[in-house]
Amino acid sequence: VGTWRQLDALARTLYLESVSFDELQQFSKNKEQLSAAVPAIWPIDRSALHNNHIGAFSARRMHPVLGYIRPHTGIDFGCDRGTPVYATGDAVVETASASGFNGGYGKQVLLNHEFGYKTRYAHLNEVLVKPGERVTRGQIIARTGNTGRSTGPHLHYEVIHKGVPVNPINYFNRNMTPEEYERLMENMRETNFEKL
């Protein structure tokens, strides 16, 4: 019986390693598309921030309008109404709501970046894209506003990975310039993952 358990454990380990190897091979084939799709830049120009105001991602916080504790699944960038909003990675527009309350988000854009990533841009004043449209990193997709359940002009930005909201701050380097980011991405594209 002990030998069968050991063989079973070995078979499971080999299976997991083969799945991981298959994923690595697929990643290698798709690395350029992945590097362009993963949300990785600031959704607004940092110089547009009011007093460097960035509201935190939080599992629980006091909602400023509703007055009770609930999750805050994104981060908020305090800025003037009309500030340009950029796609943070290559994607297809899944939702572009140019009117309505939309569950408190107001006017919003939801981008599908593939590879399990989506990003949401909410409380917009103006939506500049349409569902089904392909957008590229750095493209202006909207302008900030104060629509929906909001206390003032800002951008609410979410990163959703495999259906779960994750902290967007982990997806961009606050000190990295666009040029530095492009150099990093170029180095990643030149890396041969098949030899790792």
Residue ranges and their predicted role:
Residues 1-53, 57:
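Non-catalytic extracellular/periplasmic "stalk"
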Residues 46-194:
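Catalytic cores of peptidoglycan-degrading enzymes
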